[in-house]
Curated annotation (Swiss-Prot):
Domain of life: Bacteria
InterPro entries in the record: Flavin_Rdtase-like_dom (IPR002563), NADH-dep_flavin_reductase (IPR050268), RutF (IPR019917), Split_barrel_FMN-bd (IPR012349)
Lineage: Bacteria, Pseudomonadati, Pseudomonadota, Gammaproteobacteria, Enterobacterales
Family the entry assigns: Belongs to the non-flavoprotein flavin reductase family. RutF subfamily.
Protein name according to UniProt: FMN reductase (NADH) RutF
One Gene Ontology molecular-function label: FMN reductase [NAD(P)H] activity
Length: 164
C-alpha cells in the first residue's frame, strides 16, 4: 500500500480553495469559536453540513459538550477576524472584535457574515486526529454583501458575486 506523507498531503490540499468560516458555540460548557475551512455540504434533505474539528484543539471539549454550533462564512475584508479566531487569542477578545446576534440554537451568529448556518450536532465520526461533526441546520441567515472570502494556496482571496 502506498502511503502519502503528511507534508505531501498538506501541500496538495493547499490547491483546494475553500470558504473561510468561524465556527461558534455557546451553551453549558461555555462560549467558544475557531476558524475552519474544513466545512462542506452533506445533503439538502435534511439540510446537513459537516465541520471537521481536531480533538486536540482547546475548543474541542466545549463543542463536544454543547452539541450546537453556528458556521459563519466570512466575507472579504474579514481576514483579521479569521486570524484572531485561528490563533491563541483568549475567547473573550475574539468575540469582542465583532458584532454578534444569538441564533435559534443559542450560538453566536456573526452579524456581518456572508451566511450563517445555525446547527445542532446530529452525529460525530472520529477519523485520525479529527472528529467529523455532522450538523443538522435549524436556521440560515444571509447578509447582502457581494464579496466572499476563500483560502487558497495558503492565503486569502476575495471573490465577487457575478452580476445578474
Amino acid at each position: 500500500m502506498n502511503i502519502v506523507d503528511q507534508q505531501t498531503f498538506r501541500d496538495a490540499m493547499s490547491c483546494m480553495g475553500a470558504a473561510v468560516n468561524i465556527i461558534t458555540t455557546d451553551g453549558p460548557a461555555g462560549r467558544a469559536g475557531f476558524t475552519a475551512s474544513a466545512v462542506c455540504s452533506v445533503t439538502d434533505t435534511p439540510p446537513t453540513l459537516l465541520v471537521c474539528l481536531n480533538r486536540g484543539a482547546s475548543v474541542w471539549p466545549v463543542f463536544n459538550e454543547n452539541r450546537t454550533l453556528c458556521v459563519n462564512t466570512l466575507s472579504a475584508g474579514q481576514e483579521p477576524l479569521s486570524n484572531l479566531f485561528g490563533g491563541k487569542t483568549p475567547m473573550e477578545l475574539r468575540f469582542a472584535a465583532a458584532r454578534w446576534q444569538t441564533g435559534v440554537t443559542g450560538c453566536p451568529q456573526l452579524e456581518e457574515a456572508l451566511v450563517s448556518f445555525d446547527c445542532r450536532i446530529s452525529q460525530v465520526v472520529s477519523v485520525g486526529t479529527h472528529d467529523i461533526l455532522f450538523c443538522a441546520i435549524e436556521a440560515i441567515h444571509r447578509h447582502a454583501t457581494p464579496y466572499g472570502l476563500v483560502w487558497f494556496d495558503r492565503s486569502y482571496h476575495a471573490l465577487m458575486r457575478p452580476a445578474c
